[in-house]
Amino acid sequence: MDESILYVPAGPEGSALAASLHSTRQNAAFRYADSKFLSAVCSGQKAGDRLFLAGSKPLITVYSWGKESPDQRIPVPEPLTCMALCKHPSNEKINHKVPTFQLPWLLAGGSASGKLYIWELSSGNLVCVKEAHYQAINVLKFSECGTYLVSGGADARCSVWKTLDLVTIDDPETQKTASALTFMDHTLAVTDIWLTTGIRSDIRLYSSSKDGTVRNYDITSGKLITTFVLPLSVECLAVDPAGRACYAGLSDGTIRTVLQYKVNPHTSVLEAVGGNGKVVTLATDPELRESFVHHQPHRVTSVKVSLDGTTIISSDESGRVMVADAVTTQVVKALSPATSPVIYLAVDTVVAGSQFGRFEKKHRLIPQLKRVLVDGDLTKHFVSMEFSEEIKPQPDFDLWLQQKAEEAREVEEEKPKQKEQDSETEKLAKLTKAYGDLRQKHEQLLREMSA
């Protein structure tokens, strides 16, 4: 397995690039990638995936993975400031091959007016328009399971929406409902949002703001867990896959490590930092043990963490993309710099040695995105889907082990029974032999007495 880094610069003259994290290979390139900060999103980094970019005009530019020039330019109601994709809900009962033409389920976009737009990509229908914030929406994120959509705006609010309530087109009253949760603890604009992966009842929300704080919330209970106070404005953040640390990119070019667990010096026990709404002020780090300074003095625009949590990938407003070791904080790799600030950074796991840049010629264009809300009549709801052949069920390894264990148990249980049966057979043979000898003796005595 390998990891691929996709970074998109700002401005119409830039080119988005995808490069390998563990080698010098360049996987893909996209020319004329006009986009603004956080107004880009990618469905993946393999054949059939797409890159969506939104610039200063009310247009969405769509690229097919592996093709340098754009495939489509789709008009939208107004310029979008951020976007997010929601995958199709998983269903373990469906077991089909991945089709050539595949699209995510939903595309969400936020605007400078505070409106939230949601399109269904398979049909192009506009399924939701909502006045979500009082000011511009800065960031949108779907949870991994697709249950929640979280929006952060310049009005210092974080709103948690239930996806099902937003896309229920046959019940207008459901779409009028307010957000499930609204967090108003920040005092300045929200700059980034991070949602942890895992079970639905244990999703944590991390939000950063220009007020210099990173706040950790529990979505299930709606409670503030911990507030981390940093010395400068927090521009972006990323969380370790195991939840061990949070990495906050600051406005002066520093990336600060915010540990979520520390060893108690009195008890020598590893304990969680904060909790129960505590405010934790991070101490200065003069020895730079928990700080990455390779981007100074340029503002950090994005931070990502590798799959194993040992590598930090970051970008800044000068166009540099750096790879650093999470333990030593030393730079281990520098990618080809962009000519303008990097506004989008994504890291995906891919198959090593595969055709990363291969363009799927049999692809189809996605439907045009509507600018008017869809009719609530479900009989008029048409979607474009490709059905692939069903995969033959493979033997379940766990079931095979269980069957072998049962067979071994049956063999072990048959051994005592076989021993008992052999013992009874031997005893019967002895009795038969003794009876035969006794009969011969009786016949001999009878002949002697008769004579």
UniProtKB/Swiss-Prot annotation:
GO terms for cellular component: nuclear pre-replicative complex; rixosome complex. Residues 408-428 are annotated as: Disordered. Pfam families: WD40. It is found in: Nucleus. Keywords: Nucleus, Repeat, Ribosome biogenesis, rRNA processing, WD repeat. WD repeats lie at residues 89-129, 132-171, 185-227, 229-271. Belongs to the WD repeat IPI3/WDR18 family. Component of the RIX1 complex required for processing of ITS2 sequences from 35S pre-rRNA. PANTHER family: WD REPEAT-CONTAINING PROTEIN 18, WD-REPEAT PROTEIN 18. This is Pre-rRNA-processing protein IPI3.
